[in-house]
Amino acid sequence: MFYKMIENKCKEWYNSENCTVRNLIEYIEKTGQMRDAQIEAIKVYLFLKIGCECKPLEFLFRYGCFNSINLNNIELSTATREYLEENPAATALFEYSRLTNDKGEQVSEKLEKQIKKDPSSIDYDAFFRTAFYGVSYTDYLFSLPMGAGKTYLMAAFIYLDLYFALNEPTNPAFAHNFIIFAPSGLKSSVVPSLKTIQNFNPAWIIPEPAATDIKRMISFEVLDQGKTANKSNKTKNPNVQKIANHQPLSELFGLVAVTNAEKVILDRIQEKSGQINMFEESDDEKDRQANELRNLIGKLPSLSIFIDEVHHAVSDEIKLRAVVTKWAQNHTVNSVIGFSGTPYLEKTEKFKVVDSLSVGTD
């Protein structure tokens, strides 16, 4: 339901004078190559990138960036009204509590009453931090209907980021390099994903000559090769070499790497009861190689990490979040963008608001 607030604000932004991409969206609609669900996702993506400066969702909700509610139309005590007017995070949660789902059911009448009665009883910042898993980096999830063309949407996002990054090279909202994690459970998913992205025609979403210029700048790498031993029996990781070939990494622009996270990025990581061990001090050659690749990817500047089918294995999810969190400490991660063809949560998650009240998010 958080999405409803984002969607409402996106529509408001798109129709306002602040929107700088209306002509671009009209161009995309005119070419007629993208599906409606893809165009809607592109609108939201550009709103988050440009209208919201690619900030983390937790930050955007806490600072009221998605607030659309008019408090003047609601019966409130003077004290509550003043509290909400001075606390955008409180207003955000208040607006969220009043949303209705497709069946017309309110998110939480109890929460609305609690805020009206005693708004200062809730730690709003803590609620939003918990609701978005406490991550410090930008992490957006796009859930599209099955068959709506997720991989083409990834390609569109890549080209759009590079298009704006070329115009504003120092704007931190736009990614310069990309790594795509193909679904873990599918052994043969990496190459088809790459081919689909390579076959994408950027002129469907970006006018010429920019479309062709950007296509020429992109270099693709598949990180799927096993270890190779040279004559000295010293094993090498060819995936490391593929990244290292793009030195100097600090100036790298337009790299699109595709890999299987489970086999490559999460190799040699142990997860037990939520605790992660990357064996960084290990003398084992395989541990060393796995960490060498992870460390190198962590140096790629303005990196956007695309995760296809984010909802698969829970253990892999924990490992992947640990790796991305470590990369984010280098201040090289622009964003993590998840793509799913099915709802991410099998059941509604509940987050505590006050001791006697929890709220579900979906």
Ranges and model annotations:
Residues W13-S143:
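Conserved pre-motif I regulatory segment
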Residues K9, E40-G51, A156-F164, E168-P169, ...:
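Short, hydrophobic/amphipathic alpha-helical patches that form generic packing surfaces
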